[in-house]
Amino acid sequence: FFFFFFFFFFFLFSLHQNSLSQLIQLVRGKLEKASRRKIIATITLDVHGRDVLKGLISEKTEGPEAFAWSRQLRFYWAKETRDIQIRICDYRTLYSYEYIGNTGRLVITPLTDRCYITLTTALRLMLSGAPAGPAGTGKTETTKDLGRAIALCV
């Protein structure tokens, strides 16, 4: 079972690297401003995806029940309801389809991931969150980026 997941993650990682290289070549060319912004946002999210795959491989994640997998912000298509479900840890919600605009995306770090987990756990408990810290450290941008990810105006 472990070998299957390891091979699967390695295969995905190889495909992902190829796709990322193609996007980087595309953004180096001549593009309109809006197209460049979209591609750069896609590259930012793809680099995070690559890092997640690397982490899953290095942690020898044994299946979808592992915390290394459940702590990631994930999107699932529900055929029965024809909706997109968003999951992270114990939090589950439907995609809200709130278009925020063609904006850049935040570079997701381990601290950003922890903030996402904390804020979504608060939402699950019908509470709210107020990130705290020094000025200019990305508290507002992290909250706004989570809103963009789940398509919910915050």
Indicate residue ranges for each PLM-predicted region:
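Extended, charged/polar low-complexity intrinsically disordered regions
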Residues: 1, 9-110, 114
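Helical mechanochemical/support elements of P-loop NTPase systems and associated helical scaffolds
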Residues: 111, 115, 139-142
